[in-house]
């Protein structure tokens, strides 16, 4: 299979694409792949580092409000279609897949005009603007959250899960916590707000640390690189059971030894924790389109797999709520079971099946 794939802007669009590529390689189904992104997006740093072929288009996203820059957005989109078609004609893909973000718009639309089989993947509970637009032209729409199906043409939708889930589903408890001076046999709370950190989560955790320091569990707190020095400087002396770090490389590898996670509710994080059955306290970012992180979190909370706490609810009761949950093994076990039930450990295989079925119909 010759594949062109595009997704960018955030890790939530990039990592599912990379997970799909990895699965195709593992199954011996990938002859060649070209990743299409932008020069400015996060994908421009992440994808080339993997050794994949990487091409760029000059695009930008829409502003949600009335803005003159939206005229530039349209102009760049229309202007990039010719370049996108040339990329496709030169590479000659069998199929083109988009995993979200404005960058995927031009290459997917161009593929539909060239009658190349196309699939888009929507990882959130609210459809992205680009995916909503593309859904009217592509062949299939793969989704994670069933509730987002209503945003797309019903005859194109298939529930596959997030490919990132399959990438982590086989992980087992290990000694990774020892790298941080913690005991993998002791109940562990992991708190982080993403690679850049989340100031409101950081503030809430810093305020809670003196209380958690007296509890019978250990804490690993990743502040985000930007905030680490400032936070470390103002922390009091803490016991050996609490470790504060700027960032955790290969975050999924540590999850099997985590008793409770405090984090944002991005699609990739939720795919990972449900694949592994990790109970979570989810604090959705309010700074995302259509509050999709809140809706992502609610999808887990309604099934008993997580607790949703908004930033406005990060009050003086937050530290004790976490202690109560950490001390309630039965409650966390029930949450873990519910989380695992929501996981899709074969998500990549399901998406690949959609792709191969589509290709077989075109032959």
Curated annotation (Swiss-Prot):
Family matches, as SUPFAM superfamilies: UDP-Glycosyltransferase/glycogen phosphorylase
In the UniProt record, which is one GO cellular component term? plasma membrane
Q: Where in the cell is it found?
A: Cell membrane
What's this protein's name?
UDP-N-acetylglucosamine--N-acetylmuramyl-(pentapeptide) pyrophosphoryl-undecaprenol N-acetylglucosamine transferase
- Annotated UDP-N-acetyl-alpha-D-glucosamine binding sites: 10-12, 124, 195, 248, 293
Q: Membrane topology for this entry?
A: Peripheral membrane protein
Where mainly found?
A: membrane
Superkingdom as given in the UniProt entry: Bacteria
Which key words are in the record? Cell cycle, Cell division, Cell membrane, Cell shape, Cell wall biogenesis/degradation, Glycosyltransferase, Membrane, Peptidoglycan synthesis, Transferase
Q: Which reaction does it catalyse?
A: Mur2Ac(oyl-L-Ala-gamma-D-Glu-L-Lys-D-Ala-D-Ala)-di-trans,octa-cis-undecaprenyl diphosphate + UDP-N-acetyl-alpha-D-glucosamine = beta-D-GlcNAc-(1->4)-Mur2Ac(oyl-L-Ala-gamma-D-Glu-L-Lys-D-Ala-D-Ala)-di-trans,octa-cis-undecaprenyl diphosphate + UDP + H(+)
GO molecular function (one)? undecaprenyldiphospho-muramoylpentapeptide beta-N-acetylglucosaminyltransferase activity
- For this protein, the Enzyme Commission number is 2.4.1.227
Tell me which PANTHER family the record gives: GLYCOSYLTRANSFERASE (PTHR21015:SF22), UDP-N-ACETYLGLUCOSAMINE--N-ACETYLMURAMYL-(PENTAPEPTIDE) PYROPHOSPHORYL-UNDECAPRENOL N-ACETYLGLUCOSAMINE TRANSFERASE 1 (PTHR21015)
Species, as recorded: Lacticaseibacillus paracasei (strain ATCC 334 / BCRC 17002 / CCUG 31169 / CIP 107868 / KCTC 3260 / NRRL B-441) (Lactobacillus paracasei)
The entry assigns this protein to a family as follows:
Belongs to the glycosyltransferase 28 family. MurG subfamily.
